[in-house]
Amino acid sequence: MKDIIAQFKNRTPKPIYLLHGEEAYYIDRITQAAEDFLLDEHEKDFNLTVVYGKDVNMDQLQEQVKQYPMMAERQVVIVKEAQDIKSWDIMESYFSNPVSTTVLIIAHKHKKADSRTKFFKNVSKHGVVFESKP
């Protein structure tokens, strides 16, 4: 967890973070650190997007992560309650080739993500996977 927060403070993030596991507290801390450190206050209006798994339209999410930031070095897209998303299939091409100016944070709380899925394997290959344990 400290390594991820240090990446955010130093503004050297990876393109994708999968935060998953039983302990929601650490996932919330990392997500808040991303909001606090990756963008300046004046950049957040146009470059910080927070969506919730049960409400997200996956086509729109895919379009959002492929956009370029507005008057900033990067954009940050946070998917909270990602455990409610049934399928990440539409995002597979993005996970294989993420946009370098987007930081996608997937907060998958209260259970582990299935490490056998293509989704998990691609995120592991191109990003950071953090398991939050009690």
Predicted regions located by residue number:
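Conserved beta/loop motifs at nucleotide-recognition and modification sites
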Residues: 1-134
